[in-house]
């Protein structure tokens, strides 16, 4: 005789709330991470939209020279940005109630800190929610692991780098041109193009794009025909079908002959693991590189490393990059730095006379 024991359903309001939060039958899964994710991302998104449209100029360098970033103050979609919190605030926690007035809070770039901190909490909770839903559905946890790469990258540029540099004013502005400015200044100050971790990140992103295109084109080119010439090949697939939709043997044979045999995967599972792991590991390394350069452990310096027998410098591309770095450094924050650090550190030659 088989006895079926049913769990007694809680009748309390809290019990029903818990069941609803953790139910996988909802159209959108909420989960306990979602309880924190939803308000933080809504807050970050709302403040970003309002500030991008209407925030007044921000004194980013702390020298009473405000920089305009919003649409209503003369910017467009490309030039507009949420200006980072002022250097006068540094790394201080700067909520609205810490300012003497809302005007002061806006002038010192308070919205940037508010948006960034809520955003980072939100995306971290989104990652946790991915794990939570996978766990409840009996799936493996690799979706959340893959998402940890962009979370690590965002944390590096919005939090770790400002901490290492001593001010949120060094964080990445929230806009298109602001992002480019951040990249240029980062190169000038840290020589990121000569950092091996950044090189691994470039290989991860470009390699991931290449492998994705190769995989998609191979699969699309080796579909098992289920339709006539007058129908789209896509109509030959039915959602949930058990049989394969493409011929992996044909794809393997094609690619093995195109390059060489062992360049082609004969295991679909290891292939898809590779497609996921390659860009994820690359972006992990980039985030780690940003986090180390935050504390001024910079890219390689090969300046003036090649000389002739007379001691004269033979320029290499490293010297060309160094010259570009100096030019970018003297141009950024031009009113905040009377003497850029790299130039001010050069010893003045003695004059005999």
Curated annotation (Swiss-Prot):
The keyword Transmembrane applies. The D1/D2 heterodimer binds P680, chlorophylls that are the primary electron donor of PSII, and subsequent electron acceptors. It shares a non-heme iron and each subunit binds pheophytin, quinone, additional chlorophylls, carotenoids and lipids. D1 provides most of the ligands for the Mn4-Ca-O5 cluster of the oxygen-evolving complex (OEC). There is also a Cl(-1) ion associated with D1 and D2, which is required for oxygen evolution. The PSII complex binds additional chlorophylls, carotenoids and specific lipids. This is Photosystem II protein D1. It is a multi-pass membrane protein. The lineage of its organism: Eukaryota, Viridiplantae, Streptophyta, Embryophyta, Tracheophyta. The record marks 190 as: Stabilizes free radical intermediate. The record marks 344-345 as: Cleavage. Its main location: plastid.
């Amino acid at each position: 005789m088989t006895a079926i024991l049913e769990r007694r359903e809680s009748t309390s309001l809290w019990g029903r709330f818990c069941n609803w939060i953790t139910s996988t039958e909802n159209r959108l899964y909420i989960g306990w991470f979602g309880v924190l994710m939803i308000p933080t991302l809504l807050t970050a998104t709302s403040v970003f939209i309002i500030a991008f449209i209407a925030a007044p100029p921000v004194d980013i360098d702390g020298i009473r020279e405000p920089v305009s970033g919003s649409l209503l103050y003369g910017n467009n979609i490309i030039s507009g940005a949420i200006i980072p919190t002022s250097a006068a605030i540094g790394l201080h926690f700067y909520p609205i109630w810490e300012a003497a007035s809302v005007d002061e809070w806006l002038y010192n770039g308070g919205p940037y800190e508010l948006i960034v901190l809520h955003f980072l909490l939100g995306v971290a909770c989104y990652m946790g929610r991915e794990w939570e839903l996978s766990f409840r559905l009996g799936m493996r946890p690799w979706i959340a692991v893959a998402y940890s790469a962009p979370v690590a990258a965002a944390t590096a540029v919005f939090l770790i780098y400002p901490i290492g540099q001593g001010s949120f004013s060094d964080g990445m502005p929230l806009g298109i041109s602001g992002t480019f400015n951040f990249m240029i200044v980062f190169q000038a100050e840290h020589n990121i193009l000569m950092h091996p971790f950044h090189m691994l990140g470039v290989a991860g992103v470009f390699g991931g794009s290449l492998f994705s295109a190769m995989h998609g084109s191979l699969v699309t080119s080796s579909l098992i025909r289920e339709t006539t010439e007058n129908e789209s090949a896509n109509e030959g697939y039915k959602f949930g079908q058990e049989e394969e939709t493409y011929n992996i043997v044909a794809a393997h044979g094609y690619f093995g002959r195109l390059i060489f045999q062992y360049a082609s995967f004969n295991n679909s599972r290891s292939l898809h693991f590779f497609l996921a792991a390659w860009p994820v590991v690359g972006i992990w390394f980039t985030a780690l590189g940003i986090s180390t350069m935050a504390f001024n452990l910079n890219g390689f310096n090969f300046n003036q490393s090649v000389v002739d027998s007379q001691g004269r410098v033979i320029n290499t591309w490293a010297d060309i990059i160094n010259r570009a770095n100096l030019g970018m450094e003297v141009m950024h924050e031009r009113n905040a730095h009377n003497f850029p650090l790299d130039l001010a550190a050069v010893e003045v030659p003695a004059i005999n006379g």
